[in-house]
Amino acid sequence: MSNLFDATALVVPFEKLRMTDVEIVGGKNASLGEMISQLPSGVKVPTGFATTAHAFREFLKFDGLTERINAKLDALDTEDVRALAAVGAEIRAMVEAQPFPADLETAIREAFVTLQGGQPDASFAVRSSATAEDLPDASFAGQQETFLNVHGIDEVLHKMKEVFASLYNDRAILSLIHISEPTRH
């Protein structure tokens, strides 16, 4: 960890991220932070913020979502393609319906106001940067959603849930189960 932010942070501005933060914010976010730190060298990178792996775990723990997801995954016959599709759709719907914990939503809203900088027509990208995407023994790259031209905090919050839910697409569920990815439990 780069020591530029608290380990229990829910949201971190890119400016405070470094490559040493991959396990906390994922490879894409850490790379953006590293590039921003090189701005004096002439590198131009759009600013932003990342939600942390801790924030994602808190989101999943809220209202027992982790237990409900794990119950679905534990009962899943991964050889049954129809069951996989049905369970995946159920889990994604559960994630998208899950409210944010109040402290996480507040942190996101505050970071958004700072990022928006008084420009109400600004548009944003909401994308994954899963901590497992860039690990040498796992290949999750390209499995999670990316949304461009997102306007306003309410749409950002909604798209964030869709990105979280995309961790449970059918291919990702199989990957999670077969490599026993720690985010499952």
Segment roles from a protein language model:
Residues M1-L176, S180:
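N-terminal beta-alpha lobe that positions the nucleotide/phosphoryl donor
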Residues E181-H185:
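Short "domain-exit" segments at the C-terminal end of structured domains
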